[in-house]
């Protein structure tokens, strides 16, 4: 993937860039692998906003991605197309299996139209092949990693993401995640070889607010710039700091929301570096 930069012909074009989509081989999705995707506008079933800054955007269809691949062990598949998916940053690959089945997978880097991929313990170590961690050599770069055997890929699925298999000991494999965290994962869990493609995605400059609106992202307005009727931080004479611990528009305290005693925390060997410890 490359990035095409625009000339500053208008204020919105100044500094903006777009993917060149050179790797895309098909513009319409496989009809049997898409489902309707109605928009919620960030509202729940009673109409209350539960997620702010969502609404509008272009219509989309959801592409059904195969995050498991267990049922196709030993069945060869040809990469028929590399496609754009509006629901994720990564590209997706359409596989035609020799038994006639069609499936979508996350497209890894260097996977091309016409390549063959396979799943199963005896598959070769090459991009796009899916194997249990116990059958992958230490040091291999992988993506689309399961957290529980048979649970489907959960980690390293976005553009440019990858995980490194750093060790295997007993029934656990140690993985270095993109955040720097090292975590134990059951060796029966499966992963796909290679890193996710479209790594240049993070370098795209959207250029103007309108392009974000096309994606369904609405403006983020600070609470301190609102009126008291709109937000607990609103109001005051002149500029204020809000005068209290940060809260959401409903008055609920904001900040760290991750459970500190999550069950899977016991599998973390080394925590990710945060704040001043990032260096």
From Swiss-Prot:
Record's keyword terms, sorted: Ribonucleoprotein, Ribosomal protein, RNA-binding, rRNA-binding
KW NAD (keyword) present: no
Position of the signal peptide: none
Organism superkingdom: Bacteria
GO terms for MF: rRNA binding; structural constituent of ribosome; transferase activity
GO biological process, alphabetically ordered: cytoplasmic translation
Matches recorded under InterPro entries: NA-bd_OB-fold, Rib_uL2_dom2, Ribosomal_uL2, Ribosomal_uL2_bac/org-type, Ribosomal_uL2_C, Ribosomal_uL2_CS, Ribosomal_uL2_dom3, Ribosomal_uL2_RNA-bd_dom
Region entry Disordered, spans: 1-20, 25-59, 222-279
One cellular component term from this protein's GO annotations in UniProt: large ribosomal subunit
Biased composition (Basic residues): 50-59, 269-279
NCBIfam families membership: rplB_bact
PANTHER family associated with the record: LARGE RIBOSOMAL SUBUNIT PROTEIN UL2M, RIBOSOMAL PROTEIN L2
Record note on quaternary structure: Part of the 50S ribosomal subunit. Forms a bridge to the 30S subunit in the 70S ribosome.
Annotated function: One of the primary rRNA binding proteins. Required for association of the 30S and 50S subunits to form the 70S ribosome, for tRNA binding and peptide bond formation. It has been suggested to have peptidyltransferase activity; this is somewhat controversial. Makes several contacts with the 16S rRNA in the 70S ribosome.
Family: Belongs to the universal ribosomal protein uL2 family.
Protein name: Large ribosomal subunit protein uL2
Native source species: Renibacterium salmoninarum (strain ATCC 33209 / DSM 20767 / JCM 11484 / NBRC 15589 / NCIMB 2235)
